[in-house]
Amino acid sequence: MEIESKFKRICVFCGSSAGNKVSYKDAAIELGTELVSRNIDLVYGGGSIGLMGLISQAVFNGGRHVIGVIPKTLMPREITGETVGEVKAVADMHQRKAEMAKHSDAFIALPGGYGTLEELLEVITWAQLGIHDKPVGLLNVEGYYNSLLSFIDKAVEEGFISPTARHIIVSAPSAKELVKKLEDYVPRHEKVASKKSWEMEQIGLSPTCEISR
């Protein structure tokens, strides 16, 4: 059954590897299916391998638009065979993140490695600074992100992250529950930077950061 969503496009960060558990692959396909059921298009890192390949194929097969953003230098490594949807080749990693953010109404991280964490933490930081107010979610497959969430809680306890900024990131063990939480998300944190800051211009976001239609 199709469900109307307030999101037009969601950016998904995930590994170019599939991981060691079948549950990670299943979660990528499940998330892709959930996006399709809500008529949401996908923005992702552009690769055709690992979890990136699985979710992009699931969304594309479901009839939704797929936008892949990938640095030219990574194309030989992360693309094998045919890609699906629209592929945007960019100059570097910074431009990749900027383009992904610009085209998305929310962010979700599937399990992944250093690159996934770097992308995730950057969009969380942008939210904390007030550069955007788009929701950020973790698909916490079989507790994959429990240690990261514990670290964030420790940073709050030690005074490095404010309690309200802790609420920037939401998590859930299933795609359906996570997307519902993102739909219901309301920012609570105080924004640090001016909305007309240079960072906003760098990543190409509008001052109001409204969901694009």
Swiss-Prot record:
GO biological process terms held by the UniProt record: cytokinin biosynthetic process
Catalysis: reaction(s): N(6)-(dimethylallyl)adenosine 5'-phosphate + H2O = N(6)-dimethylallyladenine + D-ribose 5-phosphate; 9-ribosyl-trans-zeatin 5'-phosphate + H2O = trans-zeatin + D-ribose 5-phosphate
Disulfide pairings: none
UniProt keyword list: Cytokinin biosynthesis, Cytoplasm, Hydrolase, Nucleus
Gene3D superfamilies the UniProt entry points to: 3.40.50.450
EC numbers for this chain: 3.2.2.n1
GO terms of molecular function: cytokinin riboside 5'-monophosphate phosphoribohydrolase activity
Principal place of residence: cytoplasm
InterPro entries (UniProt xref): LOG, LOG_fam
Location of the protein in the cell: Cytoplasm; Nucleus
Root EC class: hydrolase
Residues that, per the record, bind substrate: E78, R96, K97, G113, Y114, G115, T116, L117, E118, E119, T125
Coiled coil (UniProt feature): none
Family the entry assigns: Belongs to the LOG family.
Protein name as annotated: Cytokinin riboside 5'-monophosphate phosphoribohydrolase LOG1
Organism: Arabidopsis thaliana (Mouse-ear cress)
